[in-house]
């Protein structure tokens, strides 16, 4: 039996309502949904899954939540969000990993964020500002390396067919 749960931070109704220790006692595995750090209901733009946030929450699972590492499966995203700022409001749309490049205009500069372990792109179009924290093989590698660092049970992915062609070779390299 596996049970998927969100990160142990944030909303009392969304993520703080789970007793992960008890779930860990009765389930064979807990799948930590290591994504939606900034989701559809977020009031501000941000990454889907910064490596620093993922690691901090793995530590919470192991520490304050009391879940054994051998029971934790790290869920990782094969998607990101494009955030749109327009007249002071922020909205987002989900973009599959394999479609990210086609959603960023040619010539847009990307910059590496070393704490998030992600590239970031920002551009203007039609009077709106677009921001994207890029999920790709490089950003996913950092998250998968945490599986090894903390001796977790393994990794899971949301969701198949959203990934780029280079992902599975990297997954095999990191986790085998």
Say what each PLM segment does.
Residues 1-105:
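Substrate-binding surface in catalytic domains of secreted glycosidases
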Residues 42-49, 129-133, 157:
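Second-shell loop/turn segments in exported
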Residues 70-72, 130, 151:
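A generic secondary-structure signal marking the coil-to-beta-strand transition
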Residues 76-146, 175-176:
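Glycan-binding loop/region signatures in secreted carbohydrate-active enzymes
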Residues 139-176:
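Acidic/aromatic/glycine-rich contiguous surface patches that form carbohydrate-binding/processing clefts
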């Amino acid at each position: 039996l596996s049970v998927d749960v969100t990160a142990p931070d944030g909303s009392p109704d969304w993520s703080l309502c789970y007793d992960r220790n008890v779930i860990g006692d009765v389930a064979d595995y807990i799948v930590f949904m290591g994504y939606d750090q900034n989701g559809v209901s977020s009031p501000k733009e941000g990454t889907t899954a910064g490596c620093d946030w993922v690691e901090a929450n793995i530590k919470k699972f192991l520490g304050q939540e009391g879940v054994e590492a051998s029971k934790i499966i790290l869920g990782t995203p094969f998607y990101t969000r494009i955030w749109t700022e327009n007249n002071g409001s922020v909205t987002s749309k989900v973009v599959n990993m394999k479609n990210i490049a086609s959603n960023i205009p040619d010539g847009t500069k990307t910059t590496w964020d070393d704490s998030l372990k992600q590239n970031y792109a920002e551009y203007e179009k039609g009077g709106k500002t677009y921001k994207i924290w890029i999920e790709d093989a490089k950003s996913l590698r950092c998250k998968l390396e945490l599986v090894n660092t903390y001796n977790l049970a393994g990794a899971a992915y949301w969701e198949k067919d959203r990934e780029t062609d280079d992902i599975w070779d990297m997954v095999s390299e990191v986790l085998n």
